[in-house]
């Protein structure tokens, strides 16, 4: 098992080399500090405690300061344990390079809070009939239905009722890693990730052990920009360039047409 902590930046879309649009979530994954190493002998299970982003000095407590001092660091804002993760020493850094494009990961975060909501929105209950008296004060169409049998004189625990919607821990499984950028501390995963922008997330190796697939080949923006520039130049010489041509082929055709035009001018 392996994992890392990060912050959700937002969603965007990128293109594969064959023109397919891929919706991706961009996650900022700064180097995590290993603030504790848990072992079977001492703790009863194996795990590594990862921590991210320094706390304000005014919010640091003495027990935290002592705990993080063992790892030669300061108290952090976001701290999580990753079970069965091994191979890292106390105080070492974990970066985004532990994942490779084509892998599948599970991403856990706190979903967006939506405040108080009724049962229609919160639990997808059916709206009542709007005809034959429905919709009035005696038969409101969005009111909660029966809460159970007449006997018992209580509401059974877990009954679907109005209440706070969202702001709970959610895990999205089997998201494909599209790209990792160690230099800029960026991880791109295919699809949506729970939580608002700037929300903390935990990225872990997928629990269902889905084998990695071949990494998606992304379009090279430098090559596309260069080809677009050559297409614009080719219009001056009435050359029909094709997109599947290489840059060298395009440049040679343009150079040949340029020489022919200069020869006619002389």
Swiss-Prot record:
Q: Which Pfam families match?
A: Ribosomal_L3
**Alphabetic keyword roster:** Ribonucleoprotein, Ribosomal protein, RNA-binding, rRNA-binding
**What molecular functions are annotated in GO for this chain?**
rRNA binding; structural constituent of ribosome
What does the record list as GO biological process?
Answer: translation
**UniProt GO cellular component terms:** cytosolic large ribosomal subunit
How does this protein assemble?
A: Part of the 50S ribosomal subunit. Forms a cluster with proteins L14 and L19.
Record protein name field: Large ribosomal subunit protein uL3
Origin organism of this chain? Mycoplasmopsis pulmonis (strain UAB CTIP) (Mycoplasma pulmonis)
